[in-house]
């Protein structure tokens, strides 16, 4: 679906307002980008993607907005997001295109998410969604239908383009690839963790204008430009949870109740549950059992349909296995390498020794033929299978994969 003005509209960005210092720097860099200044912007209807489009327009780029239709119904990924994105495009005087991605989203995200929960994991769908549903499809569609070879999004991350590969200190035999993925400068908003699955081919064509802004500056810039989404609140939940009301409601829609046992780590029966999909490693609240001390989930057994709980002291581990690894900014290490590992979004990176191991057949078939063992320098609480483990050296995102287990 495409909504294109018959006659080119004039942007309603106020001309008299002066950009913030951060905004001025972004505009200067956007104006200085080499090559064709025509670009597609992924618009969700939120303030971040709205400002991304607005700054590009203000910097003189030829901008076209693209919104993915992921689900039917209300919510930021559904009708509400489409309406707000269309309104922003009207305000900026740019065309708005809607891609019906519901079938892809159902296949690549919903079905795999349900399967993961049934297997006792806690999947992290956002990284996979970025890879399979957002960046690649938008780039392909924009090039085929609009002749555009670049895309911008409102993610808080940065990309550094190098003329030639260079060495880095973490693994002297490894070369950094030409297009490095870096953390966003706003440490509280950095979203590089969710982008570890992007390829070099994608990074070459992507621009993240907000990567050097703080969230507060984004709000100020959006207010300066008088964007209609300037005060729109951020979504606090996974889009599926927001769409269904809660994650439990989403899972109940796709997975039938299946009663099982809740056991103490010594084998003592403590209670019953109605589905392993409602539990995650480290969980303490909502277990439905009473005990003399707080208990945490330490294991979810899909084969026996059992949930194992124990005191917090038993919920920490000093190692894990990671599979389906995508090496973003360096070539795959062939030897042991010291890396900083982020085990969940906004968690503090911890040091670990990464040892490459033999890949699984499924990883090879999915073009992710890399696995590793991580040995942490100290025990980590609630290492959760299904979540992403992302490797850094300082601000450089080296790569990442999916936690398989201990």
From Swiss-Prot:
Q: Write out the catalysed reaction.
A: S-sulfanyl-L-cysteinyl-[protein] + uridine(34) in tRNA + AH2 + ATP = 2-thiouridine(34) in tRNA + L-cysteinyl-[protein] + A + AMP + diphosphate + H(+)
What residues does the record give for site: Interaction with tRNA? 155, 387
- Which residues, if any, are the signal sequence? none
Q: Which domain of life is it from?
A: Bacteria
| Transcription regulation in keyword set | no
Function (record text): Catalyzes the 2-thiolation of uridine at the wobble position (U34) of tRNA, leading to the formation of s(2)U34.
Descriptive protein name: tRNA-specific 2-thiouridylase MnmA
Native species: Prochlorococcus marinus (strain SARG / CCMP1375 / SS120)
Q: Which gene encodes it?
A: mnmA
